[in-house]
Amino acid sequence: YTIMLNLNRTWIEKQGDFFVESPIILLAAIIWYLKIYKNGIYCTFPHAVELLNKPYSDLFTILTSYPELENYLSPFMDAWKGNAQDQLQGQIASAKIPLTRMISPQLYWVMTGNDFSLDINNPKEPKLLCVGNNPDRQNIYSAALGLYNSRIVKLINKKKQLKCAVIIDELPTIYFRGLDNLIATARSNKVGVLLGFQDFSQLTRDYGEKESKVIQNTVGNIFSGQVVGETAKTLSERFGKVLQQRQSVSINRQDVSTSINTQLDSLIPASKIANLSQGTFVGAVADNFDERIEQKIFHAEIVVDHTKISAEEKAYQKIPVINDFKDRNGNDIMMQQIQRNYDQIKADAQAIINEEMRRIKNDPELRKRLGLEDEKGKKPDKS
């Protein structure tokens, strides 16, 4: 789901539709197959993409040879055996077209190998993981980032782990499946979630109305600079109202009368939020049983201690180099290594197809179960 919904944001609110679920199910079947095949040594996203682009007659034959995958492929097999070629081609194209945008030697390099595990709050192997997007390829890389995020969430949201934080800036640039559940449940597992974005309307546009509302209403702490429109109104309503006194003075020829009344007014009006100066923020914070905060709502200027920041920056340690992509003579071989890895993945995918088709052809019982003919009486391949 994470991969396909990041590549097709319009599908987020169409989950359950036939032509939305079909490509998701097909990709899931391929990934599950790669997990089964040879104990998962080829279970990577690039290998899944390459297999998806192989002839569907070979792919479906191989996948259906595994009983645990038959139910995944039922919609495709019905169309294939019923000669509904237009429907079948549409189902397959719905998966192929978005995923082919992710075919890239650089992306394949990053998404293969076993450099480290993603359980960042493992007490035995704690880690800091920092990933970034590329504005030029935002729609493509957001799928990869979303995949990593969804996997990390499942690994870190457990008991008996170190406390950790998931910090995401420009949240709408990626679709983070399960984010609402993470916010709601992770606190008990010492996981803090920090989300940064420009405006609520961005979140609604990219996550859909329902999911956006859940995220907005689940967070306990909120900090906001200058925002306008519906976002300012929403924040003003969230901060609530306060009973305020109002004095009115009436003057006529004979006397002056003064009246004082009280009424509920917005604690921080939307107009004030829309005109905040740089460095000035409004917000609300949550407290704990043993750490009560009387004034939870604030409107203040954040004073930055530049001296402390400078001292902290001077104490930074350089990030160690894991791979400098140089040969023994100091020559840069980055592109050669990346291209070699790309070619190897393609070769792996073709080798899987060849080996599996040979296995099926040499197994008469399996051939019969799959309804395959003996290829005009040819003997099984002994190679």
Description of each model-found segment:
Residues K159-K163, L195-Q198, R246-Q254, S310-K318:
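A generic structural motif
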Residues I183-T185, N189-A286:
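Conserved ATP-driven motor cores of ASCE-family P-loop NTPases powering translocation/secretion/packaging/pilus
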Residues E294-K296:
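Intrinsically disordered, low-complexity segments enriched in serine, threonine, and glycine
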